[in-house]
């Protein structure tokens, strides 16, 4: 299912403990780490897709989590050109996502990465709330930053401002929200500092 602009509907999952740490997993046979995410089926709502992906990728059931909130509307990112399959009938140039924040209420024994015959992840750990922004694959950093900025106030209400904190300045400097008709994030060069210059403002979209 790809929209007219070439973006595939998708859901992303931020699974958080009471202390503000989030679930971070390594992809099978790859060095990359990321949040659970996956494409939506044509007959699914975003919430239905989220619970299905949660079960497939982590083994967790709805009773093991509490849905705290979600990003409003779609957040988009483009795939790198090398990952775009131009010979397909419908060309997918990226993902448009709804991101969900879940509180983990179960036991770690409920986490089963091999729940399906084709697992997505082979290892997991808990990390600080903002850690993924700087450590996910480069082309996803913009959308991770936007998603976590939307969800941070909800996370702070649960874990407390000290546990979640603010997005690190180095992450904001490395990735600034891009602007385009498609609404995706684009990497920008780090601005040079000038004496007496005012700090660059970041739009909270």
From Swiss-Prot:
GO molecular function, one term: pyrophosphatase activity
Source organism (scientific name): Xanthomonas oryzae pv. oryzae (strain KACC10331 / KXO85)
Obligatory cofactor(s): a divalent metal cation
Domain of life from the UniProt record: Bacteria
InterPro entries the UniProt entry points to: NUDIX_hydrolase-like_dom_sf (IPR015797), NUDIX_hydrolase_CS (IPR020084), NUDIX_hydrolase_dom (IPR000086), RppH (IPR022927)
PROSITE patterns hit by this protein: NUDIX, NUDIX_BOX
CDD domains reported for this sequence: NUDIX_Ap4A_hydrolase_plant_like
Keywords on record: Hydrolase
Known role: Accelerates the degradation of transcripts by removing pyrophosphate from the 5'-end of triphosphorylated RNA, leading to a more labile monophosphorylated state that can stimulate subsequent ribonuclease cleavage.
Residue ranges of every copy of the Nudix hydrolase domain listed in the record: 6-149
Family membership noted in the UniProt record: Belongs to the Nudix hydrolase family. RppH subfamily.
Protein name: RNA pyrophosphohydrolase
Stretches with biased composition (Basic residues): 187-196
Coiled coil: none
């Amino acid at each position: 299912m790809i929209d007219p602009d070439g973006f595939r509907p998708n859901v992303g999952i931020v699974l958080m403990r009471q202390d503000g740490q989030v679930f971070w997993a390594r992809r099978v046979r790859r060095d990359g780490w990321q949040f659970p995410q996956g494409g939506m089926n044509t007959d699914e709502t975003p919430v239905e897709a989220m619970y299905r992906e949660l079960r497939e990728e982590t083994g967790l059931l709805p009773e093991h989590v509490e849905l705290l909130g979600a990003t409003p509307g779609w957040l988009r990112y483009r795939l790198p050109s090398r990952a775009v399959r131009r010979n397909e009938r419908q060309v997918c140039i990226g993902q448009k996502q709804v991101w969900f924040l879940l509180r983990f209420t179960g036991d770690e024994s409920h986490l089963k990465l091999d729940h399906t015959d084709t697992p997505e992840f082979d290892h997991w750990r808990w990390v600080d709330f903002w850690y993924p922004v700087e450590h996910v694959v480069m082309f996803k950093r913009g959308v991770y930053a936007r998603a976590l900025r939307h969800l941070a106030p909800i996370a702070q209400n649960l874990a407390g401002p000290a546990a979640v904190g603010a997005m690190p300045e180095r992450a904001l400097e490395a990735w600034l929200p891009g602007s385009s008709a498609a609404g995706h994030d684009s990497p920008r060069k780090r601005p040079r500092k000038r004496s007496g210059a005012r700090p660059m403002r970041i739009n909270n979209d």
